[in-house]
Amino acid sequence: MFAVMRIDNDDRRADFRRKMRPKCEFVCKYCQRRFTKPYNLMIHERTHKSPEVTFSCEVCGKYFKRQDNLRSHRCSQCIWR
């Protein structure tokens, strides 16, 4: 079924992990941060271009730079309190 690889030393283990990681081929032109998917790069680059527009939670007043972060906050934090 599956072959099990035994890696004896730390250097070889780190090398194996590095090779198994997906390549980050998409690079932000503003800060050089790397991404594996073009969509993630596009969302990230918006944080550099956009003015300081903020989205606030109506329940607790916390501010967010991105609307999707506010949406996540509402789902996981604020509504349950």
Swiss-Prot record:
A zinc finger (C2H2-type) spans 26-48, 55-75. InterPro entries: C2H2-ZF_Transcription_Reg, Znf_C2H2_sf, Znf_C2H2_type. PANTHER family: ODD-SKIPPED - RELATED, PROTEIN BOWEL. Pfam families: zf-C2H2 (PF00096). This is Protein drumstick. Its main location: nucleus. GO terms for biological process: periodic partitioning by pair rule gene. The keyword Magnesium does not apply. It comes from Anopheles gambiae (African malaria mosquito). Putative transcription factor. May function redundantly with odd and sob in leg joint formation during the larval stages, acting downstream of Notch activation. Keywords: Developmental protein, DNA-binding, Metal-binding, Nucleus, Pair-rule protein, Repeat, Transcription, Transcription regulation, Zinc, Zinc-finger. GO terms for cellular component: nucleus.
